[in-house]
Amino acid sequence: METQNLTVVTEFILLGLTQSQDAQLLVFVLVLIFYLIILPGNFLIIFTIKSDPGLTAPLYFFLGNLALLDASYSFIVVPRMLVDFLSEKKVISYRSCITQLFFLHFLGAGEMFLLVVMAFDRYIAICRPLHYSTIMNPRACYALSLVLWLGGFIHSIVQVALILHLPFCGPNQLDNFFCDVPQVIKLACTNTFVVELLMVSNSGLLSLLCFLGLLASYAVILCRIREHSSEGKSKAISTCTTHIIIIFLMFGPAIFIYTCPFQAFPADKVVSLFHTVIFPLMNPVIYTLRNQEVKASMRKLLSQHMFC
């Protein structure tokens, strides 16, 4: 519609990953395969933890939260992405774009804070084992879970607020396969220097600080592991290694995307694809392959339901 000779943008055109039809078909098949693994994999972890009375430790409670976040995160982007692969015109309304952006940052930040909580849990378990059951009691676990979900909500509200006050009256082509702050900001018909700085502070700097803090925490934990017996040391190192791998997979793409908002890189879409599709798949795979208790419980659960 026309208002004072300015066209108010009511929808965005997503340019997608590539313009090649053959490449789109290949990516469609690969993404569909990944997605069909992500959802069952994560829900299997949740169901396994809920159904096994032996998996009641805080570590498994937080692992269940992680699986839920991963499943939800992939659900925000992947289904629409698959539909767009089969559509000639990839259009998303302004409201749908803002909604997608909100849930992406809500769940993404929640997962980031969850990794911090899991690092705290491992620190208490390894560095203060005699006080572990007192500190990490069920009430504390639920409180920490509430805090991380609330933290993700606040972070997402800030991200959405950065977008809502911007005027969009010109170009409406988003050079991506989903709505995210860096691409949307570039379409605003006003100077966005301050907004991009705020985005760096809210997303990029926060991700970087959490990343460095987590690495420092696990460095301290690994140093303390030397005091454990051989059996305890092996299990602790395995758990910490798993967490460190997840940290790099989570924070690497996030830091790349949100600390460089002023310029676009050819690898941006590939990094975004990894962050939204590949990473949620890697979490359950890494945890189940490296955690003997979860693997044993999962095998038991599957055998019960397959041969009942």
Curated annotation (Swiss-Prot):
Disulfide bonds join C97-C189. The chain crosses the membrane at residues 26-49, 58-79, 101-120, 140-158, 196-219, 236-258, 270-289. Residues 50-57, 121-139, 220-235, 290-308 are cytoplasmic. It is found in: Cell membrane. It is a multi-pass membrane protein. GO terms for molecular function: G protein-coupled receptor activity; olfactory receptor activity. SUPFAM superfamilies: Family A G protein-coupled receptor-like. GO terms for cellular component: plasma membrane. Glycans are attached at N5. Residues 1-25, 80-100, 159-195, 259-269 are extracellular. Keywords: Cell membrane, Disulfide bond, G-protein coupled receptor, Glycoprotein, Membrane, Olfaction, Receptor, Sensory transduction, Transducer, Transmembrane, Transmembrane helix. The keyword Membrane applies. Pfam families: 7tm_4. Belongs to the G-protein coupled receptor 1 family. Odorant receptor. This is Olfactory receptor 4N5.
